[in-house]
């Protein structure tokens, strides 16, 4: 990922730190597993006027996640959301159809671009993270929240990482997530609208439960693998 795609990710992380510092500062916390790849920062001085930025200017705030839409790639360059302990639920809802996101001014890609493409309609904010209400669950089926994912990747290492994030949300009383595909020029595309197929996906998890901000980042190739997601832990600075 080049620097122009890195900046909005890093900025949204700072914004999250700003937002949750006071909320979590007095709560008890446990550390992430000991690893040199975990970035830990501790600072209480941030501008409360700092806002997320976007390389496209197409930021859309929904009820249960926020995204920055990239029209050239017909998908979000990042999706950001909080996963609190109270969000965790085993509720079962009827699976809705994917629908276009009317809040995206240029129009999000039609789900039919994925039909017979060989790729899954991979959620960025997982439906499994939004089972606490039907409205929240339904919102994850907006096509602005999906990206073409290799089927084995989606059901394998990416799914296992999503499950682990839920575990961390329960253990650390909530986390904040920024995730998306690595978007760049020259990617293969699918469908009539030329939806880009990312070669890699990233997921950045922030825990600010005691004011000592812990960030764990993953960068995983969009292909089948038998390796653990822990093999793809990277410093946040490497996601460029």
Regions found by a protein language model. Name each.
Residues 2-240:
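Domain-level detector for secreted/extracellular nuclease and nuclease-toxin modules, and
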């Amino acid at each position: 990922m080049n620097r122009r795609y890195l900046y909005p990710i890093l900025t949204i992380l700072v914004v999250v730190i700003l937002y949750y510092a006071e909320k979590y500062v007095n709560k008890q916390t446990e550390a992430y597993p000991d690893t040199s790849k975990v970035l830990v920062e501790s600072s209480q001085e941030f501008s409360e006027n700092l806002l997320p930025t976007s390389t496209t200017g197409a930021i859309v705030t929904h009820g249960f996640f926020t995204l920055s839409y990239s029209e050239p790639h017909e998908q979000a360059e990042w999706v950001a959301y909080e996963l609190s302990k109270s969000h965790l639920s085993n509720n079962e809802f009827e699976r809705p159809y994917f629908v276009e996101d009317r809040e995206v001014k240029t129009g999000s890609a039609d789900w039919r671009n994925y039909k017979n493409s060989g790729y899954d309609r991979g959620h960025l904010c997982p439906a499994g993270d939004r089972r606490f209400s039907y409205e929240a669950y339904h919102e994850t089926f907006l096509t602005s929240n999906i990206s073409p994912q290799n089927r084995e990747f989606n059901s394998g290492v990416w799914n296992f990482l999503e499950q682990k994030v839920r575990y961390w949300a329960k253990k650390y009383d909530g986390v904040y997530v920024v995730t998306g595909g690595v978007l760049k020029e020259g990617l293969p595309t699918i469908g009539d609208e030329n939806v880009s197929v990312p070669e890699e996906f990233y997921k950045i998890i922030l825990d600010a439960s005691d004011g000592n901000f812990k960030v764990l980042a993953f960068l995983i190739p969009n292909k089948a693998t038998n390796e653990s997601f822990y093999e793809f832990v990277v410093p946040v600075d490497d996601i460029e």
